[in-house]
């Protein structure tokens, strides 16, 4: 089976009918001639293994669950801003277990003023907090007892009910993310490409599984690294006509793979001296942060393609020759916990839209 872009089909149709007439019989004739005259320009659909297809479904489901969790948390934040600003001052991450346990006990400013430290301590312990509880309790208790402007009692009660309903949805979303992440990890660890992918600096299990899910394990799908880079959207697009040449970022791409590649840039900088030096060089040449990050991940995608084709693990000395090779850190961050749950990086990723 061969997949052909509908826009390409319309261009082929103009070769046989300049008047732009269209019929089912004519389209069948055009499609047949496409594969007869230009078979080398079109590829058949990839044949991925059953395990790779299952990872594809789990990785996309997990990413959707993460987006749902973020969306619900933002809705809850919007409601709390209207009647409970002291709670927002106490917690940056509303999806954290401490924030959800506290809001369950004190859904309104009135309940927050009445909240006692022993009750809050017990709630945090039930939520799974084991260390630093006294200091956390003191911080939360002090924040909730700060004076604030209040809504009328009936309005405040109604908003508290709204926040409680969103809290239940957020609890479900958090549980869904945790469950899907566990299942995704088990499936990804069984794949033979997992060790090669996670040998790259900054590629955790979740982020590596997302990349594997989008590129698959049919190695004939991308004969060269150039095709994979274009598929991920990290390779630039060059438009040349006469004396004019324009190089721009690629807009048509696999958006999920492009998003994973974007998230890969920051941990790669933290854990690869060669990548950090390469990124710094691009910035010194005048590239913006996003342009330098795309250039870095473009190189990383190319190295990943080579390692998967040759069944080799990542080697820093070969990946970035003539660059510093001393280890910067040994810790690999999680893609979601390190790059998706903080307010600062929500601002950084504000231009990435859900496909």
Enumerate the predicted regions with their spans.
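A detector of single, family-specific signature residues
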Residues: 1-355
